[in-house]
Amino acid sequence: MRFLLYSRPGCGLCEEMLAGLAALPEARGVPVEVIDVDTDLNTRVRYGHKIPVLLFAGELVCHGHLDAEEVHKALAHHRRPV
């Protein structure tokens, strides 16, 4: 499992979200793929107006600003024993 961070070059909020995510102990070791919303029209239409957008396991975690509580919930949900 990995995080997907929809972003664009020069986006200060995106850089803040990435740095904040890296600082969360529970998120350490979880890969983060940064996706430039401007490389694909469909992606730009879907996410371009609300970047940064953070997903985990295909589900929205937060957008605009990092929500540490939502990151914690997403990780806990997917790390539960089955």
Model-derived features: positions:
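Non-catalytic, surface beta->alpha helical segment in thiol-disulfide oxidoreductase systems
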Residues: 59-82
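Conserved segment of the thioredoxin-like fold in thiol-based oxidoreductases
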Residues: 19-25, 29-30, 48-50
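A short, hydrophobic beta-strand/beta-hairpin element that forms part of a small beta-sheet core
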Residues: 52-60
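Generic recognition of short, well-ordered alpha-helical segments
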Residues: 16-19, 46, 66
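Short Fe-S-cluster ligation motifs
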Residues: 40-52
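Thiol-based oxidoreductase modules, predominantly thioredoxin-like and allied folds used
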Residues: 30-41
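Local sequence-structure signature of Cys/Sec-based thiol-disulfide redox active-site neighborhoods
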Residues: 1-23
